[in-house]
């Protein structure tokens, strides 16, 4: 990925080109350190290439990487600060024990070359904070890591689930995800303080978007309503209480996820998609300092689904857990890819057929209340597990094929003592029953070893996330305080909203623009129709000093600029 382009014909956009691009647009590069190949010395060599002076100092020995950087056309150090140790490691065959044992070695080697670099540690993508991957990382590395890495992809929908999901459900899920994001960030930050005692350990959201992995009936990831969703995510991530250092939208340019689509080397014209315009508006209408803003709007209800909690009624705080009495025995399905037995309410599974088995054959169903948070915990022990990870999952008893939502905590491998494994799950508005599942997910190759699933407990927690505010936004001001900026999101899918804005101070309206489309599901993907989603000017009226009015279009993101008189 470095050196002359002629020596890397299959990697024309390598490290030098990436860094040059970041410098050109004023972005701070974030570089992921591979965990599946290489070693700490390789990571130190990378830091030398990026940050060491080209003066023959060669701080890591061996190849003079700073000299190679200079030969690549950049004599001065790039001074890269931000690095990730791995990417979504909880989804790989590597164990959390391997991860926490190697992180300090990489961090020490890299900082020996450039002490100012920051190396982030991967947290898992879940609300499993009582134990599991994130808890172990914080417990073992909490005093060492420079920041925590999270990827809060919500809502979630794949092509199979899309067959049983209406476009209306998708649209409502997209505009209802903000409360779940706040809830998840709060869990991470609370866990950091609880386990490490640190108040200086922040989060980096190095990927975010919806997880709409489908194309029919519409590629929801590229729609206007998903742009509203991502604008809403930005609103949350900007809040100081979120404790987020930086955030990276997934992704900039790519034919599937990209906010800009079209391959120029194939003669295609780059086209700005709906998500691109969100960042164009924030870039233009976000000042240097946030300003407090209160909003009042007509609420929107959502019954829950696609990984998003129900949004009905008045928001309430989380109650103390109440234990739900459930008989201790497990139910079992026929299992032919190994053997399983139950004694003293412990299910023992022997993966002795050397297959890539999808295990879900021991389970427990129980009654559940609608719109309620449940915490399900199971004692699990593993013996010589190779080729995968063991844990538990929870779902609505209607099952994956109908609900397509199964939160899981799957992280045990090798030989482990009895370990309490916990999953949190919030039921949808029409829930009647839940299912606890002993789990191993296929796809990691043949598995061998023994897993035991023992005593479990189920706790009920009352908490309502409340209805969706239909109009939300961010207020900010310029560094000198002479300009005031607003970014307003109208989540009303089909109706414009006449909006009155009251401002403390003597400001006059200067400019207003809005991201709109012909419908919430509009995209710019059609070859001859690349302006279905676009930014248009809006009329803003001053009624009297301190009060302006504007009509926010349906399904829109609007930027407003005001200047002090």
Predicted regions, residues:
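Aromatic/acidic polysaccharide-binding cleft in carbohydrate-active enzymes
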Residues: 204-309, 466-470
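Noncatalytic carbohydrate-binding groove/subsite architecture in carbohydrate-active enzymes
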Residues: 49-50, 95-234, 240, 299-302
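Short, well-ordered beta-strand segments enriched in hydrophobic/aromatic residues
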Residues: 482-492
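Surface-exposed beta-strand/loop patches in extracellular or lumenal glycoproteins
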Residues: 493-506
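Extracellular and organelle-lumenal recognition/adhesion modules and their flexible linkers in secreted
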Residues: 8, 118, 289-470, 474-481, ...
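N-terminal catalytic cores of secreted or lumenal carbohydrate-active enzymes
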Residues: 1-160
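Conserved, mostly hydrophobic/aromatic
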Residues: 22, 46, 83, 148, ...
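A structural motif corresponding to the C-terminal end of an alpha-helix
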Residues: 14-29, 109-116, 144, 187-200, ...
């Amino acid at each position: 990925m470095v050196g002359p382009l002629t020596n890397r014909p299959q990697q024309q956009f390598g490290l030098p080109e990436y860094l040059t691009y970041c410098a050109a647009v004023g972005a701070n590069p974030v570089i992921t350190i591979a965990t599946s190949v290489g070693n700490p010395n390789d990571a130190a060599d990378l830091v030398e290439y990026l940050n060491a002076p080209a003066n023959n100092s060669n701080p890591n020995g061996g190849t003079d990487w700073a000299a190679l950087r200079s030969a690549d056309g950049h004599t001065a150090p790039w001074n890269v600060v931000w690095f990730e140790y791995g990417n979504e490691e909880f989804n790989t065959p590597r164990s959390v024990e391997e991860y926490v044992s190697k992180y300090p070695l990489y961090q020490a080697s890299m900082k020996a070359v450039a002490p100012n670099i920051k190396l982030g540690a991967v947290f898992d993508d879940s609300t499993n904070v009582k134990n599991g991957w994130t808890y172990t990382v914080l417990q073992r590395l909490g005093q060492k890591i420079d920041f925590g890495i999270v990827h809060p992809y919500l809502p979630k929908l794949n092509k199979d689930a899309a067959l049983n999901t209406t476009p209306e459900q998708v649209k409502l899920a997209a505009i209802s995800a903000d409360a779940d994001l706040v809830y998840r960030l709060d869990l991470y930050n609370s866990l950091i303080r609880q386990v490490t005692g640190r108040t200086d350990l922040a989060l980096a959201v190095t990927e975010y978007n919806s997880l709409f992995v489908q194309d029919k009936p519409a590629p929801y990831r590229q729609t206007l309503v998903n742009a509203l969703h991502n604008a809403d995510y930005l609103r949350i991530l900007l809040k100081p209480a979120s404790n987020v250092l930086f955030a990276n939208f997934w992704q900039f340019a790519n034919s599937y996820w990209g906010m800009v689509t079209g391959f120029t080397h194939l003669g295609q014209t780059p086209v700005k998609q709906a998500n691109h315009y969100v960042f164009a508006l924030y870039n233009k209408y976000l000042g240097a300092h946030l300003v407090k803003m209160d909003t009042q709007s007509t609420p929107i209800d959502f019954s829950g689904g696609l990984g998003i909690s129900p949004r009905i009624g008045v928001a309430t705080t989380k109650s103390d857990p109440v234990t739900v009495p459930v008989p201790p025995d497990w139910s079992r399905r026929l299992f032919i890819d190994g053997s399983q037995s139950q004694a003293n309410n412990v299910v023992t599974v022997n993966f002795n057929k050397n297959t890539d088995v999808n295990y879900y054959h021991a389970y427990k169903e129980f009654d559940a209340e609608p719109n309620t948070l449940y915490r399900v915990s199971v004692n699990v022990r593993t013996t010589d597990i190779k080729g995968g990870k063991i844990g538990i999952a929870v779902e609505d008893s209607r099952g994956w094929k109908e609900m397509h939502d199964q939160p899981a905590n799957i992280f045990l491998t090798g030989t482990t003592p009895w370990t309490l494994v916990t999953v949190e799950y919030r039921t949808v508005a029409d829930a009647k029953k839940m299912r606890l599942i002993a789990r191993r997910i296929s796809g990691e190759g043949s598995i061998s070893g023994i897993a035991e699933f023992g005593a479990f407990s189920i706790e009920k927690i009352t908490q309502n996330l409340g209805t969706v505010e239909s109009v939300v936004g961010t207020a900010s001001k310029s560094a000198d305080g002479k300009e005031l900026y607003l970014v307003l999101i109208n989540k009303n899918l089909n109706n414009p909203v006449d909006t009155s804005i009251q401002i403390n101070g003597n400001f006059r309206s200067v400019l207003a623009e809005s991201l709109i489309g012909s419908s919430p599901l509009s995209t710019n993907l059609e070859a001859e129709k690349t302006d279905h989603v676009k930014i248009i000017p809006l009329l803003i009226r001053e009624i009297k000093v301190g009060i302006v009015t504007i009509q926010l279009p349906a399904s829109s993101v609007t930027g407003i600029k005001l200047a002090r008189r």
